[in-house]
């Protein structure tokens, strides 16, 4: 008799995606982050759902409702900090996942890559709106500053900002709609994840060598299910450690002060995972130029496949490209640090140099060094 998992209309989809899926035999731990992102999304949706049961999206009560969750709801503090730090784990896994794609040339699967970029934007939008909901000082001023950037769009900018705000400033209407969208977006992300996987399974996984692995495939289960479960345990242990020992390590103390439109915090900055983009935004003195640079800092990923000049797919056997890749990582760490610093000397010039270097590496140095490597290998 044929196994039910191979015949049942629903089970056979799951079977072909997670059980009998042929996978390259050489996948390293860098291929764990896709499944880790799935776990992060699950944790965020579950904790978010329970938080939404107790949260009120009204300017008068939002801050107090979060305090109520932490103090009076059974394990409310755990839900709140799992959700807040779960977002940080989400972005750590996201950036490592994207970095893996850049290093091993996974971007040559253009459909999967482009859906991934769309997912990155969707998750960033969700996280930004979620940060506004506790209605602390940094929530309010972060929302004001970031939404205000849209006013840089010529002609329609001011009207667009007021339309998003639902008035002439960030107020009750803004908070209510941000809550509605923050609740909705994770489900859109889940749908996009399914499309992402659909396109991935059309081509099959890449592998560290970048060489087609068709002659050497192994079933996903049990080999990679076990490997993924180990990844889950490591990540959930890290998350539990963060939540139970220093839950406010990655947050901003200003967000424990209720939102006050009459008092600006000394340094307005977003959560740590947006600081690199924020540093690029601030490094350009022109408002519209800064906004364009901010968008391009992520959107530049979409043209990476076009800029691939190497005859080899992966960087595994390309030491010169590896040096540039790790320089890019160092630049991103520098930008993250600068984004959290005040706008004064010497941080301004460091931020500007790092921003220029970021675009220079991706747009010019990477393709040029690839051509040099091709020449050295007589290709």
Curated annotation (Swiss-Prot):
Its cofactor is heme b. Keywords: Electron transport, Heme, Iron, Membrane, Metal-binding, Mitochondrion, Mitochondrion inner membrane, Respiratory chain, Transmembrane, Transmembrane helix, Transport, Ubiquinone. InterPro entries: Cyt_b/b6_C (IPR005798), Cyt_b/b6_C_sf (IPR036150), Cyt_b/b6_N (IPR005797), Cytb/b6-like_sf (IPR027387), Cytochrome_b (IPR030689), Cytochrome_b_C_euk/bac (IPR048260), Cytochrome_b_N_euk/bac (IPR048259), Di-haem_cyt_TM (IPR016174). Heme b b562 binds at residues 83, 182. It is a multi-pass membrane protein. PROSITE patterns: CYTB_CTER, CYTB_NTER. GO terms for cellular component: mitochondrial inner membrane; respiratory chain complex III. Binds 2 heme b groups non-covalently. GO terms for molecular function: metal ion binding; ubiquinol-cytochrome-c reductase activity. GO terms for biological process: mitochondrial electron transport, ubiquinol to cytochrome c. The chain crosses the membrane at residues 33-53, 77-98, 113-133, 178-198, 226-246, 288-308, 320-340, 347-367. It is found in: Mitochondrion inner membrane. PANTHER family: CYTOCHROME B (PTHR19271:SF16). Component of the ubiquinol-cytochrome c reductase complex (complex III or cytochrome b-c1 complex) that is part of the mitochondrial respiratory chain. The b-c1 complex mediates electron transfer from ubiquinol to cytochrome c. Contributes to the generation of a proton gradient across the mitochondrial membrane that is then used for ATP synthesis. Belongs to the cytochrome b family. The cytochrome bc1 complex contains 11 subunits: 3 respiratory subunits (MT-CYB, CYC1 and UQCRFS1), 2 core proteins (UQCRC1 and UQCRC2) and 6 low-molecular weight proteins (UQCRH/QCR6, UQCRB/QCR7, UQCRQ/QCR8, UQCR10/QCR9, UQCR11/QCR10 and a cleavage product of UQCRFS1). This cytochrome bc1 complex then forms a dimer. This is Cytochrome b.
């Amino acid at each position: 008799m044929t196994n039910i998992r191979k015949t049942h209309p629903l089970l056979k989809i799951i079977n072909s995606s997670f059980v009998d899926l042929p996978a390259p035999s050489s996948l390293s731990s860098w291929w764990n982050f896709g499944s880790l992102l799935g776990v992060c999304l699950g944790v965020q949706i579950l904790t978010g759902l329970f938080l939404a049961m107790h949260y009120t999206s009204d300017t008068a009560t939002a801050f107090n409702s979060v305090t109520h969750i932490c103090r009076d709801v059974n394990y409310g503090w755990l839900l709140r900090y799992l959700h807040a730090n779960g977002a940080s784990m989400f972005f750590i896994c996201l950036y490592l996942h994207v970095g893996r794609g850049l290093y091993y040339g996974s971007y040559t699967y253009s459909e999967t890559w482009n859906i991934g970029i769309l997912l990155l934007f969707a998750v960033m939008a969700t996280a930004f709106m979620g940060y506004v909901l506790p209605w602390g000082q940094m929530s309010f001023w972060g929302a004001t500053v970031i939404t205000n950037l849209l006013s840089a769009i010529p002609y329609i900018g001011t009207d667009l900002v007021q339309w998003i705000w639902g008035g002439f400033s960030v107020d009750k209407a803004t908070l209510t709609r941000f809550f509605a969208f923050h609740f909705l977006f994770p489900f859109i992300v889940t749908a996009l994840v399914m499309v992402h996987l659909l396109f991935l399974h059309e081509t099959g996984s890449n592998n560290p060598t970048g060489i087609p692995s068709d002659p050497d495939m192994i079933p996903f289960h049990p080999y990679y299910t076990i490997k993924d479960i180990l990844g889950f345990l490591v990540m959930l242990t890290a998350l539990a450690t963060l939540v139970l020992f220093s839950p406010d390590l990655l947050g901003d103390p200003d967000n424990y002060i209720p939102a006050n439109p009459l008092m600006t915090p000394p340094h307005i900055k977003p959560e740590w995972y947006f600081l690199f983009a924020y540093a690029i935004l601030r490094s350009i003195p022109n408002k519209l130029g800064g906004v364009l640079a901010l968008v391009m800092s992520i959107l530049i990923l979409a043209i990476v496949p076009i800029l691939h000049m190497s005859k080899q797919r992966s960087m595994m056997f390309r030491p010169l490209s590896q040096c540039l890749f790790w320089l890019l990582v160092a630049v991103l760490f520098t930008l993250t640090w600068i984004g959290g610093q005040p706008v004064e000397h010497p941080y301004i010039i460091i931020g500007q140099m790092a921003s220029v270097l970021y675009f220079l590496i991706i747009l010019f140095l990477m393709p040029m060094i690839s051509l040099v490597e091709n020449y050295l290998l007589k290709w």
